[in-house]
Structure formats: C-alpha cells, structure tokens
Design a protein with these regions (language model features):
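Repeated loop/turn-to-beta-strand initiation elements of outer-membrane beta-barrel proteins
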Residues: 3-6, 83-84
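Hydrophobic, lipid-facing positions within transmembrane beta-strands of outer-membrane proteins
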Residues: 4, 71-76, 128-134
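Flexible loop/turn segments at secondary-structure boundaries
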Residues: 5-7, 14-19, 103-106
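Transmembrane beta-barrel domains of outer membrane proteins
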Residues: 9, 77-81, 135-137
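C-terminal beta-signal and terminal closure region of outer-membrane beta-barrel proteins
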Residues: 44, 56, 102-138
Length: 138
C-alpha cells in the first residue's frame, strides 16, 4: 500500500502427537511436575492422566498434541518518497522492521512443538528476534 510493504509467513503443523515423558513425578530427568494438568481425581475423572502419583518410569502414557500455528516471519518495509530523499541528496531510503518466531499457538507443554524436544537437555524454545534496518543509497 503506497510505499509500505508487509510480508507475513505463518507456519502450521497439524496431526502430530508425541510422548512427553517429563510429566509426572520420578527421577531428576523427569523433573517437570504439572500439578494442575488434568490428573485423575474423584472430581476429575480424566482418562488421559492416570494419577499424580503415577511415576511414568519409561516415559509412556503421556501423549500430547504437537499441533501448532506459528507466526514465523513478519516484515514491514517503508520506502521513502522520491521528493523527500532528493532533498537529502540520496538515491533511496528504506526503513524496515522484521520479526521471527513472534508467537506460537499450541497446546504442547514443551518448549517448542516443532522440535518436540522431551528431555531436560533440549528444552529450548525457538528464539524470538526483532530487527530494525535502515537502507540508504547515495
């Protein structure tokens, strides 16, 4: 629109499930303990989480959806008009703002549903970055 350009890339994956063995009590490698995560209780007769006391020794029984929609790349560029830049004695002037991995919509409780990392040494989220740029031509 006019001198403005917007570019958006949305990444989505549907139909993924993975075991998430870090749920439950147990040894240190299963150190993620989610007290309010749908455990079976007399009031909550869930059939997805057996019990908070279930040790889940082998990492089974905790299959979770890895479906996600991620706002992966957004770029906004403004090209300054010729009359303005000619007064400054330059050939072109462009201002840009871009972002990567701005937000992920998911029910996955790990750090990143795309990587599906399920052990404590790889629970790192995708880095979120924002960059501002200025392009000047003489």
């Amino acid at each position: 629109y006019k001198n403005l350009t917007l570019s958006v890339f949305v990444n989505a994956m549907q139909g993924w499930i993975s075991s998430f063995g870090l749920i439950g009590r147990g040894p240190a490698e299963r150190s993620l303990n989610f007290i309010d995560y749908g455990w079976w209780t007399p009031e909550n007769k869930s059939n997805t989480r057996p019990s908070l006391m279930h040790e889940n020794k082998y990492g089974h029984n905790y299959y979770l959806s890895r479906n996600f929609v991620r706002i992966q790349d957004v770029s906004l560029v403004y090209n300054f008009s010729k009359p303005l830049i000619e007064k400054m004695k330059i050939s072109h002037l462009k201002l840009s703002l871009s972002g990567k991995n701005l937000y992920t919509f998911t029910d996955w409780i790990g750090a990143d549903p795309e990587s599906g990392a399920i052990d404590r040494d790889s629970l790192y989220p995708m880095p979120r970055t924002v960059v501002v740029g200025l392009n000047v031509g003489f």
